[in-house]
Amino acid sequence: MLTRTRAVPASSLLPRLWLALAALIFVSLTLAAHAQERTVRIGYQKYGTLVLLKGRGSLEPKLKAQGYRVQWSEFPSGPPLMEALNAGAVDFGSAGETPPIFAQAASDVLAYVAHEPAAPKGEAILVPKSSAVQSVADLRGKKVALNKGSNVHYLLVRAIEAAGLTLADITPVYLAPADARAAFERGAVDAWVIWDPYFAAAEAGGNARVLADGTGLVPNHQFYLSSKSFVAENGPALDAIVAAVAEVDAWAKDNTDAVAKELSPSVGIPAPILSIALKRQTYGIRPLDEAVTKEQQRIADTFHGLKLVPKTVDIAGAVRKPGS
């Protein structure tokens, strides 16, 4: 027996066709949006404004509105972060004065975007409390631990110069902070040049005495850095990042105890100790002015003169221009 198939009226097919078409358009637009979405890769360290910015999540909405997503990568210190920036693995990050100079000597990639005010009390030369070393001049012939190419490298250079010594008069021992602290505590080195919060943690440990901090020797600026190509192509995104950092700075300046509690788990240092470090920190992101640019050039020229970097570098030529 044959079964007769009833014809479906064209009028009843139209709604289904419209739904299918709408779904197709939605999927196409979604795929197109994801294809157009760009990524800002931000390098951060365990301590500082950028890790606060990451934790608060306030940057993501600002950049999403411009078609960007944010990818965060943690680094143990400034030098490897700058290496990643030179290699094109990071678009934005922060470091002290010395790491960008070593990076510039290696490649003409880096751009200075902004800086925080000077914080000379945030780094120091430490000796054991029982040490016979009473002045920087007493470091002659001693082993001094430091992170090569970091901010404290310049502090050591300036401090021994002021004491009438040269690098040849001491034995630098290049170690990352954790290894340097271990060497310091077991007496394998005579002094340790270090920055906050490791400086504050060593003080709190009870066996460290401050031989000299950066006061009168170095400014100890914190710089925000990018690549020249990223600056040229992503000006509005950089402006959004700087604005987000400024917001976090404004909050952190008046809430150091709250900041300490927020950072403590990631840094692995108790909040009360972090509070000491944070009170030595400065806040207020701003563009590089002529004075800061000249001081950074002075640091670069010093390292070149000591043959610690292989060539001269041009700081002013790497500074982001207003409106770019």
Residue ranges and their predicted role:
Residues Q36-T166, T171-Y174, D190-D196, R209-L211, ...:
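Short, glycine-/small- and polar/acidic-enriched structural segments
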Residues T98-P99, P172-V173, P177-P265:
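Pocket-lining segment of extracytoplasmic ligand-binding domains
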Residues M1-L14:
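N-terminal secretory signal peptides that target proteins for export/translocation
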Residues L29-A35:
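Sec/Tat signal peptide C-region and signal peptidase I cleavage site
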Residues S12, L17-L29:
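Bacterial N-terminal signal peptides
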Residues D301-S324:
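Conserved C-terminal helix/tail region of periplasmic/extracytoplasmic solute-binding proteins
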Residues A232-L308:
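Secondary-structure end/capping motifs
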